[in-house]
């Protein structure tokens, strides 16, 4: 996409990623028998992938990548910052991680309220019987508007599609099967999921 001008001497380059195949971007921690996946593509993953591709194109001419000024500028010295690629909304916008402080009324999906707001306490007092629920969405786009309820957020959210697959462990290498029927699962982002990321670089 065209670069976005910045108020500083840096520019923002937007890029889109579409998964051509299911992707597992494993997260640290969790159950030992389950491999969960991140709901976004981290900037470090994008950096590593493009650095590997750059090296593949430059070999064998670039024998010492760490000593190559171009490689250092793109991938090592911080001149270029690779930001996370987050889910793309239905209208082609980059969504952002949902703040933990955002909640909604039970059974109401299009309005969100910020518990960190100094006015939220008044909202709770005015609605003593309201049940407040976390948004439970990894990515959202919030548009602040004013209506009869005061300042509220119109909510647009997205949960990237993923699939969980089950497999037997293969601790019996010769037979190629599990000795005790032990299974493990992994979660993969589905092929076709779209993401938008940003690259910050000098003008």
Each model region followed by its residue ranges:
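Conserved active-site/ligand-binding neighborhood in enzyme cores
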Residues: 1-203
């Amino acid at each position: 996409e065209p670069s976005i001008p910045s108020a500083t001497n840096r520019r923002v380059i937007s890029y889109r990623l579409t998964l051509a195949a299911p992707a597992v971007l494993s997260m640290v921690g969790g159950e030992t028998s389950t491999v969960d996946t991140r709901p976004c593509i981290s900037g470090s993953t994008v950096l590593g992938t493009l650095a590997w591709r750059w090296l593949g194109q430059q070999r064998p001419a670039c024998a010492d990548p760490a000593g190559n000024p171009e490689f250092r500028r793109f991938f090592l010295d911080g001149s270029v910052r690779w930001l996370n690629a987050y889910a793309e909304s239905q209208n082609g916008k980059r969504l952002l991680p949902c703040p933990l402080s955002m909640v909604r009324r039970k059974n109401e999906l299009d309005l969100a309220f910020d518990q960190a707001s100094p006015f939220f306490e008044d909202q709770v007092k005015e609605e003593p019987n309201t049940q407040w629920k976390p948004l439970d969405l990894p990515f959202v786009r919030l548009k602040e508007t004013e209506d009869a309820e005061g300042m509220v957020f119109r909510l647009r959210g997205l949960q990237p599609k993923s699939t969980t697959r089950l497999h037997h462990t293969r601790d019996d290498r010769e037979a190629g099967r599990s000795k005790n029927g032990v299974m493990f699962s992994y979660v993969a982002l589905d092929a076709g999921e779209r993401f938008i990321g940003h690259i910050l670089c000098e003008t």
